[in-house]
């Protein structure tokens, strides 16, 4: 799993419910909308028109019950849909989030850990920018077991040098296998 670097929380109860349950919810995770169909473009933007309408319908129902819950949007194109949910429905800015590059970061840390043969929890790196094709990795912020990436390859023998561009490409496209 790409999220193995995240801490496990055994006291979390996740369940599916109707919109009426939003009234008492502390956190709402929105995953509404269709996926990219096999044979279609692997660009998240093909989902835009359909998912904007799905987001609008979903948000109408959510805000009829609450504006107090933390709302986490996962649906794609994530950045645009989160913006629409926040601005069109005036959801409190401090309570609405898109997962952004959080999952991209988890994927990157796991993939780099696998290459370096270390536990993903020992990799610190970030994927930044917009979720999707324009994200980037600030390599000067990456460290592995506390060693800056720029020094890691010379201190530890790897089977082959790390191809930064290839790794970034894999991070970008691996999420599309889920979408």
Q: Where in this protein do the model-derived segments appear?
A:
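Conserved N-terminal Rossmann-fold NAD(P) cofactor-binding segment
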Residues: 1-26, 34-35
């Amino acid at each position: 799993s790409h999220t193995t670097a995240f801490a496990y929380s055994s006291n979390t109860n996740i369940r599916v419910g109707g919109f009426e349950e939003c009234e008492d919810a502390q956190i709402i995770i929105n995953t509404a909308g269709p996926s990219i169909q096999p044979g279609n473009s692997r660009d998240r933007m093909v989902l835009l028109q359909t998912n904007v309408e799905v987001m609008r319908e979903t948000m109408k129902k959510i805000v009829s019950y609450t504006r107090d819950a933390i709302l986490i949007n996962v649906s794609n194109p994530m950045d645009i849909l989160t913006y629409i949910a926040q601005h069109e429905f005036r959801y409190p800015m401090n309570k609405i989030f898109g997962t952004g590059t959080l999952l991209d970061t988890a994927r990157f840390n796991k993939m780099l850990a696998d290459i370096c043969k270390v536990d993903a929890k020992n990799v610190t790196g970030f994927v930044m920018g917009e979720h999707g094709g324009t994200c980037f990795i600030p390599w000067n912020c990456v460290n592995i077991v506390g060693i800056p990436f720029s020094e890691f390859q010379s201190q530890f023998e790897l089977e082959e040098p790390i191809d930064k561009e290839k790794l970034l490409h894999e991070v970008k496209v691996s999420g599309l296998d889920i979408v």
